[in-house]
Amino acid sequence: MNRGFLCLASTAILLCQTFHPDFAETHTNLISRVAIGNANQGSPDAAEGKTEGINYYVDCRVGETDGDGRSPLKPWNTLDAVNARSFLPGDAIYLKRGTECHGILWPKGSGSPTAAIHLSAYGQGARPKVIAGKNDEEAFKLFDQEYWDVDSIEFSGGTIFGVFVSGQTGILHHIHVRNLLVHDVHGGEVKNKESGLVVISPGKLGQRFDDVLVDGVTAYETNQWSGILVGGGNFGEVPEQDWCSHVIVRNSAVHDLYGDGIILFRVKDGLIDTSAAWHTGMQPTQSIGTPNAIWTWMCTDCVVSRSEAFLTDSPGVDGGAFDIDWGNTRNSVLESYAHDTQGYCIAVFGAGYVTRDSLVKGNLCINNARSPRMARYQGAIFLWTWNNGVIENLGVEKNTVYWTPPGSFPAILNRADIRGSQNDFRENHIYSGSPLVLDSNNKMSFQDNRYTTCGNDGSTWIFGGRTYKTFEEYRSGAGQEHGSTWKTEKVAARCQGGQRPQEAKSISGIQATKIAGDTGRATLPGWTVISEIPASMDTAGLFDPAAAGQLMILKNLYTQFRASGLRLRITLSLRHPNSPESLGNAIRDLDLSGIKVSSPLDHESPSLTKTRLVAPDGTTVREWHEFLGPAEIGLAVRSVLGEPLYSLMELEAQ
């Protein structure tokens, strides 16, 4: 959070019950667009009336040739040949897999609404690598260009950016980047937030982007600011008509960053879905702001859904997971998972502007605010306004919080000027290891909540500036918590994130069950997640968004629990046959090292994902028959294996 620039953070999600008619209609439209209209977004074969262009090939392993680049037998052998050409709609540039090219890649030209330019890979093996020179500002660049599909390349190096897309002229359309690996951007002192690994940002006031897709991108290691940033622009006041629009970031992961993880700034109609961020806010000394993992700022109709943040930090304040920041309208954080953070789980802020129609629903918070400094002033759910800011209409609903702070600090901290007709904190489950459960002004209404305090007999509640020593005293004296309950548990571990409440449904809407198992069941080497995922592949050789999202969630789970002995087995049930080469490349690009993946040709494809958590003796302990979000599977595995062994996770990642 840069208080001088009034910049904090924000977020949103899918499948929401809403409390405001306009809000409900807008988010229903967004969800419908994401689920149906964008099922093929980013696929080169999705465009109708595609203009036929020329295919060009690049093989940097080949020595000097007189190749014209128009066949794999006569490829270009340097990036200079690519950078010198202005490509036309329908053209395609293919870099050979398993090769390295050195220098910046900046192909010129633009596609058209019916024929994007395609930059991709050919052959078999690892993604082709583009390695920036030590003085290059970026590894890949587009500037004042539009209608580009870029996929299946590894970019490394750059002093300011890994991937940088910008411009100075009007509206630039259709920038789709998919299946990229971007890493090791190291330069001098970080100057602004429009820097880092993947940055798609206007270069001038009045310039913006429309139709941006960042899909299946893994980005890590930078001493610049951002993991993935879309929007922004350091221009002061920017009218809403000049904000970027129709932006999707999905199935992506960022980690080991000086600043923010995944952020949307000045965006209309934005989505961050099935993505993850960790080791954010690693800057040693604060210089330009205080980061969070995943958030939005100055965003209208933006959603953060089914995403995960952990091991977040900050050189100052914030250091949280998710945040609906000031200047946002109709933003949501839904069905997401925040755990083991230095700062808060979820915040909603207002400063200088009105933050309107915010929804925080169905999220899971475990082991947040590990910093005593941050725990004291933030809590797990943090509502705050300053500089005459206002929050208008806010719903905090059906979230589960496991709160074990390093001191007697409240799980819920509300210091916000909240106005409007519907400002409800309801149907939440709060497990607090602190006797001080809640500290709120009287601007919020509390009802139908379930509170549990652990390890002590009493509880303390602060509401409207008055302190209450029992729950009944608080409920009667404050006139709050109609339909709510409170109980105490002697065992402190009950508040550490063991299980969801028995009466609650799972986040994804179906209660998983314990299954007895057969007497002849096979034993396993350890706790195992077995998942059968229906999938399809496009002509670029990439998995469909739903399958890619489930794979990303399971991969992130395995990254955390591999050192604890977790096994992961995945069966990909392809709806249509694909070449072994394409399938092999797609699996290799996912970097599923240590994960058993199979794709039998004669396997009947299920219509829904099926996932099981299986004990070492072969007993199926939990089973799900639909897309499985990070919170549900994360909690289930954590309940049997405990907190991830993060120190060993670091060693295995090296």
Range-by-range predicted roles:
Residues 116, 123-125, 146-157, 171-186, ...:
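Right-handed parallel beta-helix
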Residues 608, 616-654:
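Thiol-/selenol-based redox modules, centered on thioredoxin-like
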Residues 94-97, 112-161, 181-190, 216, ...:
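Right-handed parallel beta-helix/beta-spiral solenoid domain characteristic of secreted/periplasmic
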Residues 40-44, 48, 60-96, 100-101, ...:
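Acidic Gly/Asp/Thr-rich repetitive segments characteristic of extracellular carbohydrate-active
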Residues 537-593, 598-601:
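Structural microenvironment flanking redox-active thiols in thiol-disulfide oxidoreductases
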Residues 56-61, 76-101, 116-123, 149-155, ...:
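Glycine-rich repeat segments that build the extracellular carbohydrate-interaction surface of secreted
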Residues 106, 132-141, 157-168, 189-206, ...:
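Extracellular beta-strand/beta-solenoid scaffold signature
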Residues 27-49, 118, 197, 418-511, ...:
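Acidic, glycine- and Ser/Thr-rich low-complexity intrinsically disordered tracts
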